[in-house]
Amino acid sequence: MTKRTLGGTVRKQKRTSGFRARMRSHTGQNVIRARRKKGRHRLTV
């Protein structure tokens, strides 16, 4: 059997679309703001 190669890594996911990554840029902060306004339970990944 061959291995599943398309697993995805948690570290990369957090680094690209985690909370601190979002807060780093102005547009990312807009994303957080919009999700707060909408009432999302999960702001980021």
Curated annotation (Swiss-Prot):
InterPro entries, alphabetized: Ribosomal_bL34
Q: Which UniProt keywords apply?
A: Ribonucleoprotein, Ribosomal protein
Q: Which GO terms describe its cellular component?
A: ribonucleoprotein complex; ribosome
Disulfide bonds listed in the record? none
Q: What is the lineage of its organism?
A: Bacteria, Bacillati, Cyanobacteriota, Cyanophyceae, Oscillatoriophycideae
Gene Ontology molecular function, alphabetical: structural constituent of ribosome
Q: Quote the Pfam families the UniProt record gives.
A: Ribosomal_L34 (PF00468)
Supply the gene name.
rpmH
Q: Which family does it belong to?
A: Belongs to the bacterial ribosomal protein bL34 family.
- This protein is called Large ribosomal subunit protein bL34
Query: What are the Basic residues biased-composition ranges?
Result: 11-25, 33-45
Q: What does the record list as GO biological process?
A: translation
Q: Where is this region: Disordered?
A: 1-45
